[in-house]
Structure formats: structure tokens, C-alpha cells
Amino acid sequence: TKNGPVDFQPREPYSPLFTAIEHTDQMVEFQVTQEYLGHSNHIAYLAPMWKEFFEFVPANSLKAVAGVANIGTDVNWCGHPFAQSNWYAFGRLAWNPSLSSEEIAEEWLKQTFTTEAAFVNPVKDIMMDSREAVVDYMMPMGLHHLFAWGHHYGPEPWCAIPGARPDWMPSYYHKADKVG
């Protein structure tokens, strides 16, 4: 079951299936790739999002954790060096969901770059703020699916493609248009 009920949006509630289905083993599916979070063009550290999920759905109620990674042909497989931190965070939280996002970010930075506090501390702060920064401009006012046609890099609430499926258009979900 996907962690949220929509489709790996920058912010969405956890899927109600996790608490509604009591007698069925479940596995959560997280999206490690940054499809709706700027692909690999933006720093979007996802551990805080996954920690939010585990605050509502106890890890011991799950049988497994899966991740959609979508590696590419880039030298580092991820496109952006900081996208690798999400792979690391996914593995660490799958193994031990009680770890904090900050602990994981610090571990990854020290193992990847340097142990120097002058680097680790400010970059960890950037990582910890990154997902909220992406949410703020990808989902202004909490509105989701505002993405441009043909890519998910940024908002395009005015998008209207003749003949396209209505549920693929930004205004379908929130009914906002140029008049309000």
C-alpha cells in the first residue's frame, strides 16, 4: 500500500488502509525517487516525510517496507548527489524506524563528504528544511497536482490541455482557475 492515498504527493495524509484493514498483513511503499518533488533537480530530503508516516502507522504493524527508486543512467544513479541521501534514509528507516531524520542526515553527510562540523551542521540544516521548501512551492496553499504538463518540476495551475483526461489537469482536484 502506498504511504499516502493519492500518488506520492509532496504532502498527503497516510493511507487510511493502514488502520482500516485489521486482519491483513500490510507492507508500506515509499517513493524514494523524487517524482513529485523536483525529480533530481532539487534537494528534497525525504526522511522527515517517512518519519511522519511512522508517527501514525506503527512500524510493528507492518510486515515489510518497499521503496520505488527508479535509478537512472547518471554516474551516481540518482542524478543529484543529495538524492542518494534518500536511498540511505530509506534503508536506515526500514531497518530502524525509531531513528531520527537528523541522525540519519548526519550519518549520511559524514560518510559521504566529511566529518567536519563546519560542513555537516549547516548542510544538515539545509537537508532538514528541504522537503518543506519543496512543499511550499509545489503545493502552494496545500493544493496538490498543480504540476506542469509533461513534467513534475514545478507548479502550473493554469494548465489546460484540450482532450486530456480531466483528472490529469490541476483544476480537477481543487476547482481553482484564473477566476478563482
Please describe what each predicted stretch is:
Residues 61-69, 73-180:
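C-terminal non-catalytic alpha-helical accessory regions
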